[in-house]
């Protein structure tokens, strides 16, 4: 609903079976605005232990948080222990990341469609790496391609301390 209010339209549905994710991408009619990809973890496909941890997290959230204007970047609304994080990480990197960071962008992708100096994603990747950015190489530096009407690369986030309820790592 948050993107629809801004004029974005749902354009594509995706299934990442190995990661237990369902995703959707949104586009604004103004093609200078970014495409947005939202993914959802299929919690019911995780173990009962992982499901219980996630339920405990969700139960700590005030119901009103999902309607707030800042919901998409509102961060973590729960306490989670390092052991709970590790349990989630053992099953799903996505679940563990969400437990640690909450609601916020996981990564950003580079669109070459509007660049004037190059129209090759490989050139953009080279520029990013030369500037010190680390690319997400899981599945290759370039994901997708002409067959799915999308080719993308993404950078990795910097390392940062994560505060759990019982320790900071």
In which residue ranges do the predicted regions lie?
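Extended, well-ordered protein cores
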Residues: 1, 11-169
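The feature marks the mature, well-folded catalytic cores of soluble enzymes
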Residues: 2-6
């Amino acid at each position: 609903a948050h993107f629809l209010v801004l004029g974005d339209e749902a354009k594509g549905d995706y299934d990442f079976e190995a990661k237990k994710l369902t995703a959707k991408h949104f586009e604004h009619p103004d093609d200078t605005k970014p495409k947005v990809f939202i993914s959802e973890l299929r919690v019911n496909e995780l173990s009962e232990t992982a499901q219980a941890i996630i339920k405990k997290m969700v139960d700590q959230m005030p119901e009103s948080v999902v309607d707030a204007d800042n919901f998409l970047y509102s961060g973590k609304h729960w306490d989670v222990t390092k052991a709970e994080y590790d349990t989630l990480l053992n099953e799903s990197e996505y679940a563990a990341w969400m437990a640690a960071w909450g609601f916020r962008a996981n990564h950003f992708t580079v669109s070459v469609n509007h660049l004037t100096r190059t129209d090759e994603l490989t050139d953009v990747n080279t520029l990013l790496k030369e500037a010190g950015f680390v690319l997400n190489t899981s599945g290759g530096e370039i994901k997708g391609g002409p067959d799915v009407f999308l080719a993308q690369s993404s950078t990795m986030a910097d390392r940062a301390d994560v505060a759990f309820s019982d320790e900071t790592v």
